[in-house]
């Protein structure tokens, strides 16, 4: 990895899971909540045009999974009820596999939105996150988020934290609609969308493959490990354990 040149950084691009937000919150709160609510949500909103479109996207994804021999549960179209049941069973299968496919993430985002709005869910971030956001804003850094969760889910998470609504600090949200997080082209698209050169970005994530993809696109990157006793992975470059280490006062 090339040495980090903080003087060039104008945009701080952040991962969520394991970086701004505890992994346990994602896997022990958000995912189980979506799984529990999936059937009732789909049945209640199946006739909504947006949800109907997501169900159709799931059907197309199902065909792709079959072609790739991933052995998803069967999808039948014998009747509206059978189609609905197929979409629910397939959705549960995708959740169990921690799939990052866009229609599932959008559907999860809709379910989580209801949970956040009802107060059943509240966003979680590490304690250093709101402090860092305020510090970076003082230093005139642009803060953006890139997560596999839908943009809607990202916004709801940061809007409902114990520290209050943090979305005013965030200029842009990106999800897998821009591309897979382990592919360099995704980071190139993000840079182009903000009309910035890649070296103006500092990407922070807990995933080595994502770090490598960002670096391949020309971005600067830091591996974030919230475990203070973890060793840096080979080739990961610089590693931090807290946002206090990024543009600290």
Language-model segment annotations:
Residues 65-127:
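Metal-dependent phosphoesterase signature
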Residues 5-26:
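Asp-based phosphoryl-transfer active-site loop
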Residues 20-24, 152-155, 212, 230-232:
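Short catalytic/ligand-binding loop motif for oxyanion handling, primarily in non-cytosolic enzymes
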Residues 1-8, 168-249:
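Asp-based, Mg2+/Mn2+-dependent phosphohydrolase catalytic module
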Residues 16, 146-150, 206:
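Short, well-ordered beta-to-alpha junction loops that form the rim of enzyme active sites
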Residues 109-110, 118-161:
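Substrate-recognition element of Asp-dependent hydrolases with the DxDx(T/V) motif
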Residues 26-92:
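Conserved phosphoryl-transfer catalytic core
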């Amino acid at each position: 990895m090339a040495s980090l040149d903080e003087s060039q950084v104008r945009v701080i691009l952040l991962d969520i899971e394991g970086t701004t937000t505890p992994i346990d919150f994602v896997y022990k709160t958000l995912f189980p909540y979506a799984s529990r609510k999936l059937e009732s949500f789909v049945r209640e909103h199946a006739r909504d045009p947006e949800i109907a479109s997501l169900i159709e996207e799931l059907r197309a994804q199902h065909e792709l999974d079959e072609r790739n021999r991933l052995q998803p549960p069967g999808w039948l179209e014998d009747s509206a009820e059978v189609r609905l049941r197929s979409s629910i069973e397939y959705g549960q299968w995708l959740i169990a596999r921690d799939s990052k496919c866009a229609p599932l993430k959008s559907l999860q985002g809709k379910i989580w939105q209801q949970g956040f709005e009802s107060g059943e869910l509240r966003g979680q971030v590490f304690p250093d996150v709101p402090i860092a956001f305020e510090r970076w804003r003082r230093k005139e850094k642009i803060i953006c988020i890139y997560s596999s969760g839908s943009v809607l889910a990202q916004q709801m998470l940061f809007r409902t934290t114990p520290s209050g609504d943090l979305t005013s600090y965030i200029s842009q949200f990106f999800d897998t609609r821009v591309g897979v997080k382990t592919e360099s082209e995704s980071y190139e698209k993000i840079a182009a969308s903000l009309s910035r050169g890649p070296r103006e970005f500092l990407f922070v994530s807990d995933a080595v493959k994502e770090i490598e993809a960002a670096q391949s696109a020309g971005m600067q990157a830091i591996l974030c490990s919230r475990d203070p006793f973890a060793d840096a992975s080979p080739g990961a470059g610089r590693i931090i354990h807290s946002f206090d280490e990024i543009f600290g006062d």
